[in-house]
Regions:
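Extreme N-terminal basic, low-complexity initiation segments
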Residues: 2-14
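P-loop NTP-binding core
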Residues: 16-330
Length: 330
Protein backbone atom coordinates (compact mmCIF):
# COMPACT_ATOMS: atom_id res chain seq x y z
CA UNK A 1 0.00 0.00 0.00
CA UNK A 2 1.70 3.23 -1.12
CA UNK A 3 2.53 5.61 1.71
CA UNK A 4 2.25 2.95 4.41
CA UNK A 5 5.16 2.28 6.76
CA UNK A 6 5.44 -1.02 8.57
CA UNK A 7 7.60 -2.59 11.23
CA UNK A 8 8.09 -6.31 11.47
CA UNK A 9 8.35 -8.26 14.70
CA UNK A 10 6.32 -8.88 17.82
CA UNK A 11 4.01 -6.35 19.36
CA UNK A 12 0.90 -4.44 18.49
CA UNK A 13 1.01 -2.40 15.32
CA UNK A 14 -0.46 1.06 15.60
CA UNK A 15 -1.44 3.47 12.88
CA UNK A 16 -1.23 7.20 13.36
CA UNK A 17 -3.79 9.46 11.79
CA UNK A 18 -3.92 13.17 11.14
CA UNK A 19 -5.96 13.97 14.24
CA UNK A 20 -3.15 12.93 16.56
CA UNK A 21 -4.91 9.74 17.69
CA UNK A 22 -3.41 6.30 17.26
CA UNK A 23 -5.39 3.22 16.28
CA UNK A 24 -4.06 0.25 18.22
CA UNK A 25 -6.93 -2.06 17.38
CA UNK A 26 -10.08 -1.95 15.34
CA UNK A 27 -12.12 0.99 16.63
CA UNK A 28 -9.77 1.67 19.57
CA UNK A 29 -7.71 4.87 19.68
CA UNK A 30 -5.22 6.39 22.09
CA UNK A 31 -3.63 9.84 22.17
CA UNK A 32 -0.30 9.73 20.37
CA UNK A 33 1.63 10.85 23.48
CA UNK A 34 0.60 7.66 25.28
CA UNK A 35 1.91 5.43 22.51
CA UNK A 36 5.17 7.06 21.64
CA UNK A 37 3.97 7.65 18.07
CA UNK A 38 4.18 11.13 16.65
CA UNK A 39 1.22 12.48 14.72
CA UNK A 40 2.06 13.36 11.12
CA UNK A 41 2.52 16.99 10.18
CA UNK A 42 -0.48 18.81 8.76
CA UNK A 43 0.75 18.44 5.16
CA UNK A 44 0.88 14.69 5.52
CA UNK A 45 -2.65 13.79 6.57
CA UNK A 46 -3.70 10.37 5.50
CA UNK A 47 -0.26 8.77 5.63
CA UNK A 48 -0.04 5.78 7.94
CA UNK A 49 3.05 5.26 10.04
CA UNK A 50 3.47 1.90 11.69
CA UNK A 51 5.25 1.68 15.03
CA UNK A 52 5.45 -0.64 18.00
CA UNK A 53 3.47 -0.30 21.24
CA UNK A 54 4.75 -3.40 23.02
CA UNK A 55 7.86 -5.45 22.36
CA UNK A 56 9.55 -5.56 19.00
CA UNK A 57 13.16 -4.82 18.04
CA UNK A 58 15.18 -2.57 20.26
CA UNK A 59 16.91 -0.72 17.44
CA UNK A 60 15.88 0.79 14.15
CA UNK A 61 18.20 -1.48 12.19
CA UNK A 62 16.30 -4.55 13.42
CA UNK A 63 12.93 -3.28 12.22
CA UNK A 64 11.43 -3.29 8.78
CA UNK A 65 10.75 0.09 7.24
CA UNK A 66 8.29 1.54 4.81
CA UNK A 67 8.04 -0.94 1.98
CA UNK A 68 9.19 1.44 -0.73
CA UNK A 69 11.59 3.67 1.19
CA UNK A 70 14.59 2.13 -0.57
CA UNK A 71 13.01 1.69 -4.00
CA UNK A 72 14.51 3.86 -6.76
CA UNK A 73 13.06 4.01 -10.27
CA UNK A 74 15.64 5.00 -12.88
CA UNK A 75 13.62 6.72 -15.57
CA UNK A 76 13.81 9.03 -18.55
CA UNK A 77 11.52 9.06 -21.57
CA UNK A 78 14.53 9.54 -23.84
CA UNK A 79 16.46 6.44 -24.84
CA UNK A 80 20.22 5.99 -24.80
CA UNK A 81 20.85 8.20 -21.78
CA UNK A 82 22.32 5.49 -19.55
CA UNK A 83 19.40 4.18 -17.51
CA UNK A 84 20.38 0.50 -17.66
CA UNK A 85 24.06 1.41 -17.33
CA UNK A 86 23.27 3.41 -14.20
CA UNK A 87 21.24 0.57 -12.68
CA UNK A 88 24.00 -1.90 -13.49
CA UNK A 89 26.80 0.14 -11.95
CA UNK A 90 24.97 1.49 -8.91
CA UNK A 91 23.84 -2.06 -8.14
CA UNK A 92 27.39 -3.35 -8.53
CA UNK A 93 28.98 -0.77 -6.27
CA UNK A 94 26.20 -1.01 -3.69
CA UNK A 95 26.69 -4.77 -3.46
CA UNK A 96 30.45 -4.27 -3.26
CA UNK A 97 29.78 -2.04 -0.24
CA UNK A 98 27.99 -4.96 1.42
CA UNK A 99 24.42 -3.93 0.62
CA UNK A 100 21.61 -6.27 -0.40
CA UNK A 101 20.45 -5.20 -3.85
CA UNK A 102 17.54 -6.10 -6.12
CA UNK A 103 17.28 -5.01 -9.76
CA UNK A 104 13.90 -5.10 -11.51
CA UNK A 105 13.88 -4.94 -15.30
CA UNK A 106 10.59 -3.42 -16.49
CA UNK A 107 11.66 -2.92 -20.11
CA UNK A 108 10.31 -5.52 -22.58
CA UNK A 109 13.56 -5.17 -24.53
CA UNK A 110 15.21 -6.70 -21.46
CA UNK A 111 18.65 -5.15 -21.98
CA UNK A 112 19.47 -5.26 -18.28
CA UNK A 113 18.33 -8.88 -18.12
CA UNK A 114 20.52 -9.86 -21.06
CA UNK A 115 23.57 -8.30 -19.42
CA UNK A 116 23.07 -9.62 -15.89
CA UNK A 117 21.41 -13.01 -16.42
CA UNK A 118 23.73 -15.87 -15.55
CA UNK A 119 24.75 -18.11 -18.44
CA UNK A 120 23.32 -21.17 -16.72
CA UNK A 121 20.11 -19.40 -15.68
CA UNK A 122 16.84 -20.47 -17.25
CA UNK A 123 14.23 -18.28 -15.56
CA UNK A 124 10.82 -19.92 -15.49
CA UNK A 125 9.13 -16.82 -14.07
CA UNK A 126 9.69 -13.29 -15.37
CA UNK A 127 8.09 -9.96 -14.59
CA UNK A 128 5.59 -10.65 -17.37
CA UNK A 129 4.36 -13.75 -15.54
CA UNK A 130 4.03 -11.82 -12.28
CA UNK A 131 1.95 -9.06 -13.85
CA UNK A 132 -0.12 -11.44 -15.97
CA UNK A 133 -1.23 -13.43 -12.93
CA UNK A 134 -1.56 -10.36 -10.70
CA UNK A 135 0.68 -12.21 -8.26
CA UNK A 136 0.77 -11.03 -4.67
CA UNK A 137 4.56 -11.37 -4.59
CA UNK A 138 7.64 -11.76 -6.78
CA UNK A 139 8.08 -15.30 -5.49
CA UNK A 140 9.84 -17.36 -8.14
CA UNK A 141 10.78 -14.33 -10.23
CA UNK A 142 13.70 -13.20 -8.05
CA UNK A 143 16.92 -14.93 -9.10
CA UNK A 144 20.63 -14.32 -8.46
CA UNK A 145 22.19 -12.15 -11.16
CA UNK A 146 25.69 -12.39 -12.55
CA UNK A 147 26.68 -9.53 -10.23
CA UNK A 148 27.88 -10.77 -6.82
CA UNK A 149 25.30 -10.02 -4.14
CA UNK A 150 22.70 -8.66 -6.55
CA UNK A 151 19.33 -10.28 -7.30
CA UNK A 152 17.32 -9.77 -10.46
CA UNK A 153 13.70 -9.84 -11.56
CA UNK A 154 14.15 -10.52 -15.28
CA UNK A 155 12.08 -9.10 -18.09
CA UNK A 156 11.14 -10.60 -21.46
CA UNK A 157 9.56 -9.65 -24.77
CA UNK A 158 6.28 -11.13 -23.57
CA UNK A 159 5.97 -8.23 -21.13
CA UNK A 160 4.76 -6.03 -23.99
CA UNK A 161 1.64 -8.10 -24.63
CA UNK A 162 0.97 -8.45 -20.90
CA UNK A 163 1.05 -4.67 -20.51
CA UNK A 164 -1.40 -4.26 -23.38
CA UNK A 165 -3.74 -6.86 -21.88
CA UNK A 166 -3.61 -5.12 -18.50
CA UNK A 167 -4.76 -1.71 -19.73
CA UNK A 168 -8.38 -2.41 -18.82
CA UNK A 169 -7.65 -3.85 -15.37
CA UNK A 170 -8.77 -1.99 -12.29
CA UNK A 171 -5.78 -1.09 -10.14
CA UNK A 172 -3.38 -1.80 -13.02
CA UNK A 173 -0.97 0.90 -11.79
CA UNK A 174 -0.34 -1.05 -8.56
CA UNK A 175 0.58 -4.45 -10.04
CA UNK A 176 4.33 -4.10 -9.44
CA UNK A 177 3.96 -2.28 -6.10
CA UNK A 178 1.78 -5.06 -4.71
CA UNK A 179 4.12 -7.81 -5.92
CA UNK A 180 7.24 -6.04 -4.63
CA UNK A 181 5.79 -5.17 -1.23
CA UNK A 182 6.53 -8.53 0.51
CA UNK A 183 10.18 -8.42 -0.58
CA UNK A 184 11.30 -4.79 -0.46
CA UNK A 185 12.28 -4.79 3.21
CA UNK A 186 14.74 -7.63 2.56
CA UNK A 187 16.92 -5.30 0.47
CA UNK A 188 18.96 -2.21 1.19
CA UNK A 189 18.40 -0.95 -2.34
CA UNK A 190 15.86 -1.80 -5.02
CA UNK A 191 16.57 -0.39 -8.48
CA UNK A 192 13.87 -0.40 -11.16
CA UNK A 193 15.08 -0.04 -14.74
CA UNK A 194 12.45 1.76 -16.85
CA UNK A 195 11.93 1.82 -20.60
CA UNK A 196 11.94 5.16 -22.50
CA UNK A 197 8.17 5.44 -22.90
CA UNK A 198 4.98 6.61 -21.27
CA UNK A 199 3.22 3.32 -20.71
CA UNK A 200 1.97 1.01 -18.00
CA UNK A 201 5.44 -0.37 -17.24
CA UNK A 202 6.79 3.09 -16.36
CA UNK A 203 3.62 3.96 -14.46
CA UNK A 204 3.99 0.77 -12.42
CA UNK A 205 7.65 1.52 -11.72
CA UNK A 206 6.94 5.05 -10.51
CA UNK A 207 4.01 3.84 -8.43
CA UNK A 208 6.19 1.23 -6.72
CA UNK A 209 9.08 3.63 -6.08
CA UNK A 210 9.72 6.18 -3.36
CA UNK A 211 12.46 7.87 -5.37
CA UNK A 212 13.08 8.70 -9.02
CA UNK A 213 16.57 9.04 -10.50
CA UNK A 214 16.73 10.64 -13.95
CA UNK A 215 19.89 10.09 -16.03
CA UNK A 216 20.29 12.85 -18.63
CA UNK A 217 22.86 12.70 -21.42
CA UNK A 218 25.15 15.71 -21.74
CA UNK A 219 24.48 16.29 -25.42
CA UNK A 220 22.33 18.23 -27.84
CA UNK A 221 18.62 17.69 -27.09
CA UNK A 222 19.72 16.26 -23.74
CA UNK A 223 16.62 17.36 -21.87
CA UNK A 224 14.10 16.07 -24.40
CA UNK A 225 12.77 13.26 -22.23
CA UNK A 226 13.35 14.93 -18.86
CA UNK A 227 10.37 17.29 -18.95
CA UNK A 228 8.04 14.49 -20.02
CA UNK A 229 9.07 12.12 -17.24
CA UNK A 230 8.80 14.93 -14.70
CA UNK A 231 5.29 15.73 -15.92
CA UNK A 232 4.35 12.05 -15.64
CA UNK A 233 5.80 11.89 -12.13
CA UNK A 234 3.80 14.96 -11.09
CA UNK A 235 0.57 13.40 -12.35
CA UNK A 236 1.32 10.21 -10.45
CA UNK A 237 2.10 12.18 -7.29
CA UNK A 238 -1.31 13.82 -7.45
CA UNK A 239 -3.29 10.68 -8.32
CA UNK A 240 -1.48 7.60 -7.05
CA UNK A 241 1.86 7.96 -5.27
CA UNK A 242 2.18 11.17 -3.22
CA UNK A 243 5.51 9.96 -1.80
CA UNK A 244 7.31 9.89 -5.17
CA UNK A 245 10.29 12.24 -4.91
CA UNK A 246 13.01 13.28 -7.33
CA UNK A 247 16.21 11.77 -5.95
CA UNK A 248 18.39 13.47 -8.50
CA UNK A 249 19.26 14.28 -12.10
CA UNK A 250 22.39 12.39 -13.14
CA UNK A 251 24.36 13.92 -16.03
CA UNK A 252 25.79 11.09 -18.15
CA UNK A 253 28.09 10.61 -21.17
CA UNK A 254 29.87 13.87 -20.40
CA UNK A 255 32.76 14.93 -22.63
CA UNK A 256 34.61 17.80 -21.02
CA UNK A 257 36.47 18.68 -24.21
CA UNK A 258 33.39 19.47 -26.27
CA UNK A 259 31.53 22.74 -26.18
CA UNK A 260 28.08 21.24 -26.72
CA UNK A 261 28.59 18.81 -23.80
CA UNK A 262 29.54 21.71 -21.55
CA UNK A 263 26.51 23.71 -22.71
CA UNK A 264 24.26 20.71 -22.06
CA UNK A 265 25.69 20.40 -18.55
CA UNK A 266 24.90 24.07 -17.90
CA UNK A 267 21.33 23.46 -19.04
CA UNK A 268 21.08 20.42 -16.77
CA UNK A 269 22.41 22.46 -13.86
CA UNK A 270 19.65 24.97 -14.52
CA UNK A 271 17.01 22.26 -14.30
CA UNK A 272 18.60 20.92 -11.12
CA UNK A 273 18.44 24.38 -9.54
CA UNK A 274 14.78 24.64 -10.50
CA UNK A 275 13.74 21.12 -9.47
CA UNK A 276 15.64 21.07 -6.16
CA UNK A 277 16.17 17.29 -6.05
CA UNK A 278 17.31 15.50 -2.94
CA UNK A 279 20.83 15.00 -4.31
CA UNK A 280 23.13 16.75 -6.74
CA UNK A 281 25.55 14.67 -8.77
CA UNK A 282 28.74 15.41 -10.64
CA UNK A 283 28.59 14.29 -14.30
CA UNK A 284 29.48 10.77 -15.38
CA UNK A 285 32.02 10.89 -18.18
CA UNK A 286 31.70 9.07 -21.51
CA UNK A 287 34.24 6.26 -21.19
CA UNK A 288 35.15 3.04 -22.98
CA UNK A 289 35.19 1.09 -19.70
CA UNK A 290 31.51 1.83 -19.08
CA UNK A 291 30.64 0.47 -22.52
CA UNK A 292 32.91 -2.59 -22.24
CA UNK A 293 31.84 -3.79 -18.78
CA UNK A 294 28.33 -4.98 -19.83
CA UNK A 295 29.84 -6.95 -22.71
CA UNK A 296 31.60 -9.08 -20.10
CA UNK A 297 28.54 -9.36 -17.87
CA UNK A 298 30.09 -7.10 -15.26
CA UNK A 299 29.52 -3.76 -13.64
CA UNK A 300 32.33 -1.27 -13.25
CA UNK A 301 32.62 -2.43 -9.65
CA UNK A 302 34.12 -5.65 -11.03
CA UNK A 303 35.44 -4.58 -14.43
CA UNK A 304 37.23 -1.31 -13.73
CA UNK A 305 36.60 -0.10 -10.18
CA UNK A 306 39.59 2.25 -10.12
CA UNK A 307 38.95 3.82 -13.51
CA UNK A 308 37.81 7.43 -13.55
CA UNK A 309 34.28 6.49 -14.60
CA UNK A 310 34.25 3.69 -12.04
CA UNK A 311 35.11 6.11 -9.26
CA UNK A 312 32.38 8.46 -10.47
CA UNK A 313 29.73 5.74 -10.30
CA UNK A 314 31.05 4.66 -6.91
CA UNK A 315 30.66 8.23 -5.65
CA UNK A 316 27.09 8.40 -6.99
CA UNK A 317 26.31 5.09 -5.30
CA UNK A 318 27.73 6.32 -2.00
CA UNK A 319 25.61 9.47 -2.19
CA UNK A 320 22.46 7.45 -2.84
CA UNK A 321 23.08 4.95 -0.05
CA UNK A 322 23.95 7.67 2.46
CA UNK A 323 20.77 9.57 1.58
CA UNK A 324 18.56 6.49 1.86
CA UNK A 325 20.12 5.56 5.20
CA UNK A 326 19.44 9.06 6.49
CA UNK A 327 15.89 9.26 5.15
CA UNK A 328 14.72 5.79 6.18
CA UNK A 329 15.48 6.34 9.86
CA UNK A 330 14.72 10.06 10.05
Amino acid sequence: MPGCSRRAGLGWICLTCGCGLVAVASGFFLPHWLTGCLPPPLWYYGRTIACFIIGGPSSAEESAVSSNDRVVAVANLKGGVGKSTTVLNVAGFAAKAGRRVLMIDTDPQASLTQVTLREDARPTVTLADVLRSRAASLEGAIIPSVLPGVDLVPSSLSLESVLNQSLSLEGREYLLAEALDPHAAAYDLVLIDCRPAIDLSVTNALTAARWMLVPVECSFMALDGYEHVMALAERLRKRINPDLTLLGILPTRYRSGTGHSQEALKAIDGYVAQAQPALRFQPIRLAVAAADAPAYGQSLAQFAPTSAVGREYETVTGQILAWLDQEVWR
